[in-house]
Amino acid sequence: MLAPRNTETGVHMSQTEADLALRPSPSLTSMGPTRLGPPPRRVRRFSGKAEPRPRSSRPSRRSSVDLGLLSSWSQPASLLPEPPDPPDSAGPMRSPPSNSKEHPEGTWTGAAPVKAADSACPELTVSSGGPGSREPPRVPDAAARERRREQEEKEDTETQAVATSPDGRYLKFDIEIGRGSFKTVYRGLDTDTTVEVAWCELQTRKLSRAERQRFSEEVEMLKGLQHPNIVRFYDSWKSVLRGQVCIVLVTELMTSGTLKTYLRRFREMKPRVLQRWSRQILRGLHFLHSRVPPILHRDLKCDNVFITGPSGSVKIGDLGLATLKRASFAKSVIGTPEFMAPEMYEEKYDEAVDVYAFGMCMLEMATSEYPYSECQNAAQIYRKVTSGTKPNSFYKVKMPEVKEIIEGCIRTDKNERFTIQDLLTHAFFREERGVHVELAEEDDGEKPGLKLWLRMEDARRGGRPRDNQAIEFLFQLGRDAAEEVAQEMVALGLVCEADYQPVARAVRERVAAIQRKREKLRKARELEVLPPDSGPPPATVSMTPGPPSAFPPEPEEPEADQHQSFLFRHASYSSTTSDCETDGYLSSSGFLDASDPALQPPGGMPSSPAEPHLCLPSGFALSIPRSGPGSDFSPGDSYASDAASGLSDMGEGGQMRKNPVKTLRRRPRSRLRVTSVSDQSDRVVECQLQTHNSKMVTFRFDLDGDSPEEIAAAMVYNEFILPSERDGFLSRIREIIQRVETLLKRDAGPSEATEDALSPQEEPAAMPALPGPSDAELQRSISPEQRSWAAFSTSPSSPGTPLSPGTPFSPGTPPVFPCPIFPITSPSCHPYPFSQVSSNPCPQAPSSLLPSSSGASQVPFPSPSLPTSSPLPFSPSYPQVPLHPASLPTCPSPPPLPSTTAAPLLSLASAFSLAVMTVAQSLLSPSPGLLSQSPPAPPGPLPSMPLPLASCDQESLSAQTAETENEASRNPAQPLLGDARLAPISEEGKPQLVGRFQVTSSKEPAEPPLQPASPTLSRSLKLPTPQLTSESSDTEDSAAGGPETREALAESDRAAEGLGVAIDEEKDEGKEPQIGGSSPILSQPSPVWMNYSYSSLCLSSEESESSGEDEEFWAELQNLRQKHLSEVEALQTLQKKEIEDLYSRLGKQPPPGIVAPAAMLSCRQRRLSKGSFPTSRRNSLQRSDLPGPGIMRRNSLSGSSTGSQEQRASKGVTFAGDVGRM
């Protein structure tokens, strides 16, 4: 027991000694009495919690530092003999061990390191430390709480919306996810769908108001775009951000980065990934370009192609921002130079710029190198791009297929680049769906049925299709659908239902590829057929339009360079074609107005109001005197003069053409047309310009605010017109402004126009002698809201009489129109024929029922279209046709017109058909008295009415006209003017030059004397029914009705007012023309196709020289004509039947005269200019006019004449004796 005590005592003593050594104040002797009572308790308190922390911790720290020293001191003290202690001191010395049971042994020695550790880890002292021991852990706890508080505040900030859309649907959070040069993108939320969106703020402070408005309109257009490869546009609005106006776009949120970030991360793109993503980009571009109007991205690059994480597909983004970027930074960098096509620098671009940018994107994806990275600045890039130098990275492309595609996309000439459709059908981008469709037999390009093979890949044979296990099927173009064929295969068990979509897609793509190939071959053939530019195009393929199954796209042929002022315009306002007419403009009255330059004398030859005007209800006979080439003026010159074009290279006025080759010269030049006129708020005219490089530019100008000089300067600056064309463009714009102002004034006072229509004598005097577009051309472009009353067709009327808004109009109801009024003036004073014909009903009742088939108006009897909107259209080969003194009643006031006069001024109630124009090559008669042999047009039955004749005897006119008709009817088999054919010209006789046209006259029959006839013509006029079936005619009519007898024809002829140049030719059978009304020339000719006699339908001297005497050419033309006749007839019959079925299904009664859409399509007529056009465009430009009800017209302007009366009768077309005959 003593040893432990000694040990414990030794330990205790060593501790005490240590304390004493550290504390120099008290001695050991003085400590004895102090340890009698309280010291042990103090020792216990020292080990307990009573002592303050400084006293308890200080020894602990010191013992830990001096542990080794204290241990060394305690060891010798235990070995030395102890001095004798007082007996009373043993108790206190032993008291600590007695109390040491509460604390384990070694509390002071062994606990010393523990306390040292506690000093390093304060949290361990909490269990035994004093009150101050909680302080050290409180410091890190506060920092953690601060961090948690900041995190919560940040989360609250991020989840709290800082802005909302005007409708409250979209929320903006203050989380920036992207920033560009002019935009900042934040995270947003669609509260309706709870889908995150991208909130884009676009700075527009540098934009003008017009540019801002334009961009807003583009964004509005982009909202409706939904495609899997297009970033969705949800909404947009204007907002004010920090006092600045900005545009906010809400788009689909793309969180997986862009192609640019992908290339930075992976550097190299695998071929299959390149193929798949490139195909998806192409699909997105194809979707944009197939919109109407096409949407151009204009800033396509890898930074704007986003990747969707879940599906791994790509989407094209930043749509519509290129315009804004160009406007904002026009003075620095326009777009992204590395991806900009050469034409982008000129700001003249189309869909091809996106193809160029796509090629650069593919180049970057294939090489992971930025295009033109070798260039130091944008100027070097510009020089390389415009010079056609490819970037250096192009030569690093390893895959030949990819290199070929890139090369085809980045060509300098945009016309040589691939199209999106070409790229989608390229083998590299073709999807492997395990289904292959191929032709079972070679395609000849003609058969409507395709024999195809469907092969399915066999997984057991390495993906190769099985041999001799193809499914052969027949696909009818235009009738079968790929989905229907695939469904039939599924129903028959040939393919499984899971393969329905791949099979349908494969069939659809193969058929589309075959059709594209056929179209290319067809165009190539047409280009081969086209003659050289030295001469006019022959009337071959250009006159054989295909069956008009649907409205074709508008051909790009504006009118600024129309080198002939046609006297006849298209006057159709049917609801089907009113918004898609090409150039058939109308005046407010629907016909040529008095201010039409085609009806005016040239400059320096003013019209004389004192000249008497002979009012002819339907027509009058004309003599055909021989006219030598030395005549001062010819109708050919008048007809072909380019008064309507400010850019004309033709002579003005009555000057004769010195160089006929110059007339039909072709060169690239701008063409201008008026598309719309609006006077709702501002008087705005919209025009369409075809530039010298065949680009279409649509522009508008204010009649009051814009000057022609400013417009011309802008056009020259933008290189839309050449500087050499500026003067012509200026004059053209001035003429358009004058015509539009005249038209708008006339529209403002229709009642005045109606009053003016009653006085035809005053009208020609007011005609300004200004060449330019006629008011008739501008009328069609008047907006429908201003022309709600304009849905009428061409019909005779007094001039300037507008159709009242309440006038009912339907295709089957024949409107009642007054007879046309024609001023007959002296040829010496009026080289241009006048026409005061209007298509609107005159308020007066003395009007005859003159039906018209132009537009939608139909006549209830078998009569071809009889529009009266044109005077006599003189074809290039048409001879001069002055009035014969004996053929028409002469008035006391006008001097007699000698037969030797070279330029008679004629205005007929209806223009001659193309048959007359083409036959006119042989119409030049040697004697001036040939009028009696010209059969007048047999008019239709008209109610009795007084015929207004200006200072002329109506009875004498009727008598003389009837005499002519009797004479003509008595010689039905006698050839009128010989065998007249369009080409080859095989008539005998020396060709003579009429104006600038070479005309050959063959036979000159004797001139029979005129015989008196009954004057009953004035009481019963019959409607002229021109059955025009010459080479140029497109009116092979088939009507319900039996053939007319010769007597009925003669009676019909006697009722005419003497249109004397009625000739019909029968080229196919080689027959002589029948005089007894075999091809009576219309007093109401078909309005539209007469326009084409000048440029392509009749042989002028140039055409004769260039085209030659090729018989095979015309034989082929005849075959094409017959083919198209049958196709159009079948189509029109089918469409008419479908319309009747539709009416029956709707429970309505079909209207009396149903016109099939194919027939209405023929109203889309435009005048042909001298410009060089491919044959396909000429096909689309030449379509016949609407036939009358019951008349089935063939839409072919080509072929030979088959116009004998017997042939017409065999085709069911008759000249009705009265209105009710059908």
UniProtKB/Swiss-Prot annotation:
> Where is it chiefly localized?
other
Record field: compositional bias (Basic and acidic residues)? 135-152, 1044-1056
- Cross-link entry Glycyl lysine isopeptide (Lys-Gly) (interchain with G-Cter in ubiquitin), positions: K154, K172, K183, K223, K238, K325, K384, K390, K447, K451, K990, K1123, K1136, K1137
The Protein kinase domain sits at 171-429
* Residue positions of motif RFXV motif: 996-999
Task: Read off the domain note.
Answer: The RFXV motif mediates recognition with downstream kinases OXSR1/OSR1 and STK39/SPAK.
Q: Which GO terms describe its cellular component?
A: bicellular tight junction; cell body; cytoplasm; cytosol; membrane; protein-containing complex
Q: Where is the active site?
A: D318
Give the first-level EC class, as a single word: transferase
- Protein EC: 2.7.11.1
Subcellular location(s): the record lists:
Cell junction, Tight junction
Q: What is the protein name given in its UniProt record? A: Serine/threonine-protein kinase WNK4
Q: How does it assemble?
A: Interacts with the C-terminal region of KCNJ1. Interacts with WNK1 and WNK3. Interacts with KLHL3.
Q: Where is this region: Disordered?
A: 1-163, 527-562, 591-612, 626-679, 747-809, 836-873, 927-1087, 1169-1222
* Gene Ontology biological process: aldosterone secretion; calcium ion homeostasis; cellular response to xenobiotic stimulus; chloride transport; distal tubule morphogenesis; ERK1 and ERK2 cascade; gene expression; inflammatory response
Q: Write out the biased-composition intervals (Low complexity).
A: 627-638, 792-809, 845-873
Instruction: Report the CDD domains cross-referenced here.
Output: STKc_WNK4
Q: Report a single Gene Ontology molecular function.
A: ATP binding
**Which cofactor does this sequence's record say it needs?**
Mg(2+)
According to its UniProt entry, this protein's organism is Rattus norvegicus
**Which intervals of the chain are annotated as region Interaction with KLHL3?**
554-564
Q: Which reaction(s) does the protein catalyse, per the Swiss-Prot or TrEMBL entry?
A: L-seryl-[protein] + ATP = O-phospho-L-seryl-[protein] + ADP + H(+); L-threonyl-[protein] + ATP = O-phospho-L-threonyl-[protein] + ADP + H(+)
In terms of superkingdom, the source organism counts as Eukaryota
